[in-house]
Amino acid sequence: MKIVILGPAHPYRGGLASIMETMAREYQRRGDEVKVYTFSLQYPSLLFPGKSQTVDAPAPHDLHIERVMNTCNPLNWIALGHRLRKEAPDMILMKYWTPFMAPCFGTIARIARKNGKTKVICQIDNVEPHEHHLIDKPFNRYYLGAVDGFVYMSEQVGGELRAYASAPAIFSPHPMFEHFGQRLERSEACSKLGLDASKRYLLFFGLIRDYKGLDILLEAFEKVADDGVRLLVAGEFYNDKEQYRALLERLGNRVVLHDHFIPDAEVASYFSVADALVLPYRTATQSGVTQIAYNFSVPMVVTRVGGLPEIVPDGKVGFVCEPTVEGVRQAIEQLYEEGTLQRFAENFPEERKRFSWGTMCDKLVEVFNQAK
């Protein structure tokens, strides 16, 4: 099959780019012809709260990646749509996570599929964004109405999708992020991160935004009595750091703050020092961070929002709690009850079987075959 993947890829950073590149490799492994078309401009700097959108690492040698898509240039969308219409791949595989992408993606898809051969298939992260705007619904309608089939990764997203599109849609959970490698020896990981190996660490990992509830976790952790446990916060602030200052000052050295983007080469170290990952989210669909934890067999505390309880069954590899200070506090204290972390560790091999890239790519082909 001839496949063009449209979305984030090198040199763009983060989990979305990793997902697209991993799927490209899986389809290449199966013998498909795969090209990846990524952005020449993803976000204008005014709309990007981080420090950099790209990485300095060399491009992967095993993938065909072209930077051809400008989200702010309608003439570019039209030209790329006509290029794809002429190239006539069997499948255009797109990832959708924010309505900001809808005008660009929707225009390209609508033009490309007019050749009567190409089907547009979407792996969809979110329908309704975490931060809402008036343009969200019309933008969603424009893009989602141009897609021939979907794979969604939480039942919440599947339900939201039905309000916009009648095309075939299949559930498949977010696969594990395996490209981060294996767990390191804890002492080695502590040394690499400059951490005191005599302490134990809970991990909050990823971009820091209001809906992720870091303030809930900080308040909950303040109430946890065990002074031998530290909270390791690793990620770049995408909102105002000042709103956390009072909490951070009260907690003092009980919180270790690494407030910068964590490059792929360092991810294994953070998960190798952690007793558990805590996701105190106020809202969620699913989270790619849980799939990093699965890769490293790190137990989790997640809140009962969106698709998180689907990914982390309560009492098997972690705890599901209410998105409140008291709920998170109780779950953290339960983690350190005798035998709990060991029991969770023993359950990981069976739970990990649900999250393969092969299954995800199979589901995308399945919905491609169902699409008209």
Stretches found by the model and what they are:
Residues 9-13, 25-86, 157, 237-240:
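N-terminal strand-loop element at the rim of the active site
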Residues 39-44, 205, 230-243, 260:
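Glycosyltransferase donor-sugar binding loop
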Residues 145-184:
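Donor nucleotide-sugar binding/catalytic pocket of nucleotide-sugar-dependent glycosyltransferases
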Residues 195-212, 218-221, 232:
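Conserved donor-binding/catalytic core segment of Leloir-type glycosyltransferases
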Residues 242-268:
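Nucleotide-activated donor-binding/catalytic signature segment of Leloir-type glycosyltransferases, i.e.
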Residues 269-285, 298:
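Acidic donor-binding loop of glycosyltransferase active sites
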Residues 276-279, 293, 299-302, 312:
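Short hydrophobic beta-strand element within catalytic cores of glycosyltransferases
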Residues 314-326, 332-339:
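Conserved acidic donor-binding segment of nucleotide-sugar-dependent glycosyltransferases
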